[in-house]
Each structure stands twice: as structure tokens, then as C-alpha cells.
Amino acid sequence: LGLAIGLGLTLLAAIAYRDNPEECGLRPDGIQSTSTQDSQAGVTGVSLQRARQTPAFWIFIAAMFMSGMVGTALPFHIVDIHVQAGLDRSSAIAMFLPTAMIAVIVHFIGGWASDRTSLRPHLVLYLLGMIVTNVGIVYLDQSWGRPAIIVGYGIQGGMARLLSSVTWPRYYGRRHLGAIRSYAVAFGVAASALGPTIFGLSVDWFGSYNVAAWGCVTILIFLLPLTAFAREPHLSGQSSQ
């Protein structure tokens, strides 16, 4: 099955995949281009090295790193988190459907709004979603704890998919998008491995997940005022697309 899927997707990618819209004579927004040469000339952007010199780059990286930690730690330990709060396994598993529905709605509305607003409000909402999620973990034994996790984790998930797709081309252009996004993904992968470990150690050392959750809340609150510095950099060598 794995071999069939691998070969099938490889063949499909070879037939249908295109490196950029300009190869099809299109612009990223879907407007038909009048000239292929003009379209190719419109692919602009700055290098990874230049992007790393901007505060906004690291602020978004930090937010996505925290999202990677929380986003993997919660599903990894979700059953035990509920058991510690006196809830059963079915309650834990039942959280994922409403969470996914909220994530889809947030992603759709956020995507529409991102074409019309700065990404900083989206980043703030992203961080707030993670804060609400972790506070919900701590107070899961309260009546509002479980809804807090569902809403917060849904917001986090919707914003995570949006910002990981929109931020890098908008802030740094598309010419070096592969290098920039790969660099960001590497941090996300590291965070995904670290998150479950930290929450697991919290249980081993302190007897609950609260220490890890409060630690995440502390870092996220620290990041909130930094969103004021996450403005679009408008670097030299990059023009609007």
C-alpha cells in the first residue's frame, strides 16, 4: 500500500505539479498575465540570510515553535491529561471533531481577512489561542476547561496553517521561498519532537502537566507585546507582487 501510494503520488506530481504560477502564465492571485516574460520578472524576494536579519522573522518563528510544541504535546498526552482531570478516554477523543471544525472556520475567515489586513492581528489571535489552550489544560477539571481547550486549540490550528502559508511569501517574497520556509519548518519539526517530551517530563518530575502548561503560557505572554515589531519589512530587492 505504501509503495502504491508513493509511486502514485510521485506520478501525479510529475504530471500536475508546477513550481510557480508563472509557469502557467498566471499570477499568484489568479489573474491572467499578459506576458510570460513580465510574469517571470515579477518573482521577487530576499535571501534567507537577509530574512533572518529582521525581527519579524524570529517573532513568527518563535510563535510557530510554540505552536509546534503545544500542537503535538496535547494530542500525544490528551487521554492522560483528561484522566488526571477525572475525565474518561471518550471525552478526550471527542474533542478533536469540534476542534477541527473551529480550525476550518478560523482558517477560512482568517484567509479572507489576511488579504485585507496586516498579519499582526492574526499573530495575536494565534498566540491567544495557544494561551487559552494551555490555561484550559490546567483547569480541565473545571466546567469551562474543556471548552477552553477546544476553542483555543481550534484557533491555534486554523491560524497555524494560515500563517505558515501566507507569512513568508508576503514578508520576504517568493524567489527564495523554499529556503526560507524550509528553515521555518525545521524549527517546527524540532518543536514537535520537544513538546511531548517537555509535557511528559512535567508529569514525571512534578506529577502533573500544569508546570509545562504554565511555562508555555509565560512564554506566550512574553511574545504578545513583541507582535508590535512583526511588521512587514519591505526589504530592498523585493517589490510588491
Residue ranges and their predicted role:
Residues L1-L3, G200-I219:
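A membrane-interface helix-boundary motif in multi-pass transporters
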Residues L3-Q37, L223-R231:
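C-terminal membrane-cytosol helix-exit motif in multi-pass small-molecule transporters
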Residues L9-A13, V79, L194-V203:
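Small-residue (Gly/Pro/Ala) motifs that create kinks and tight helix-helix packing interfaces
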Residues Q49-G110, G195:
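Extracytoplasmic gate region of multi-pass secondary transporters
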Residues G71, S91, L97-T167:
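C-terminal transmembrane helical hairpin of 12-TM major facilitator-type secondary transporters
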Residues H82-V83, A113-S114, I198-G207:
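Interfacial helix-cap and linker-helix signal at transmembrane-aqueous boundaries
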Residues R89-S90, R174-A184:
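Loop-to-transmembrane helix entry/capping segments in MFS-fold secondary transporters
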Residues W168-G178, G207:
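Paired intracellular helix-loop junctions of major facilitator superfamily
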